[in-house]
Amino acid sequence: MEHKDNSKMYGTTILCIRRNNNVIIAGDGQVSLGHTVMKNSAKKVKRLANDTVITGFAGATADAFTLFERLEGKLEKHPGQLLRACVELAKDWRMDRYLRRLEAMMIVADKSVSLIISGNGDVLEPENGIAAIGSGGNYALAAAKALCESNDKFSQNMTLEYIVTTAMNIAAEICIYTNNNIIMEKIED
């Protein structure tokens, strides 16, 4: 994510992996203001809709909390319909002059679908069950794909938690806006 304003808080890694009817969203704990680490233990993942939806955000913190509130409202209006709630949020994001200025992205998931809601108001479903956003997202995505797509016996026995933790730690080693304080939320079948 390009940092347009060094007075805003940016930078994170959010990773979502879906496997065998289980899904985890993980986020690191670092909050940066410009080039300064302001906090190491921020919680960027949370549960919504009576714990049936998990979500993580990247981008400007205040903007992300605005989107969380809007998404919660859409989920209340369309209970059990995550895709519809996200599409409705995306419509608002595109149409509303205030929302269009928000600098954040989200990954949301329930028991059946994982979605990325982009800063442009797009709703995308990852093809392979792996999604990542934020400054370290590409590193976490590459590591997670490598771990999930490996065909050796060891990789077949790796837990979802192990894959997520390993991928997030690799991202933290590379991305200066990501740390190793990983917080996860999981929905199990």
Swiss-Prot record:
Ranges in a coiled coil: none
Activity regulation field: Allosterically activated by HslU binding.
Family annotation (InterPro entries): ATP-dep_Prtase_HsIV_su, Ntn_hydrolases_N, Proteasome_sua/b, Proteasome_suB-type
Compartment(s) where it occurs, according to its Swiss-Prot or TrEMBL record: Cytoplasm
Annotated catalytic residues: 12
Domain of life: Bacteria
GO CC annotations, alphabetized: HslUV protease complex; proteasome core complex
Protein name stated in the entry: ATP-dependent protease subunit HslV
Origin species: Ehrlichia ruminantium (strain Gardel)
Gene: hslV
